Amino acid sequence: MLSPKRTKFRRHHRGKMRGVATRGNKVSFGDFGLKTLEPGWLTSRQIEAGRRAMTRYTRRGGQLWIRVFPDKPVTIRPAETRMGSGKGSPEYWVAVVKPGTILYEMKGVTPEIARSAMRVAGFKMPVKTQFVVRDV
């Protein structure tokens, strides 16, 4: 699963997900892409589940790019802990996505297979997604 090798700070603020994606919103490597339609957090497990579903569907055909990276740590406090005594310890990593962010790109397969594979991966995501084709 994806996670940073090292970070400057161990804990992050939760932040706000306002507006639409201005970067990472175009299909730039492959011919087909999976685009988000709403804001959300994608965990490294969800990103990996989508990748596995697509590679399994395409039977390792074509080429696949993952365009998002989970670089935000999410902290969780232990169960039945009293308030105070600092922030919890980092438990997992998330990628913050805005509407319009391209999650995956694919090349080297037919449009029908790409659409079906992206649809399978979209079911694994916590946000609504859409299949997009590269603008020529």
Swiss-Prot record:
Record's subcellular location: Plastid, Chloroplast
CC terms in the record's Gene Ontology section: chloroplast; mitochondrial large ribosomal subunit
Record InterPro entries: Ribosomal_uL16, Ribosomal_uL16_bact-type, Ribosomal_uL16_CS, Ribosomal_uL16_dom, Ribosomal_uL16_sf
SUPFAM superfamilies per record: Ribosomal protein L16p/L10e (SSF54686)
UniProt superkingdom: Eukaryota
A matching Pfam family: Ribosomal_L16
Keyword terms: Chloroplast, Plastid, Ribonucleoprotein, Ribosomal protein
Disulfides per UniProt: none
Keyword Plastid: yes
A Gene Ontology biological process term: mitochondrial translation
Molecular functions (GO terms): rRNA binding; structural constituent of ribosome
Subunit structure: Part of the 50S ribosomal subunit.
Family, as annotated: Belongs to the universal ribosomal protein uL16 family.
Protein name: Large ribosomal subunit protein uL16c
Organism: Mesostigma viride (Green alga)
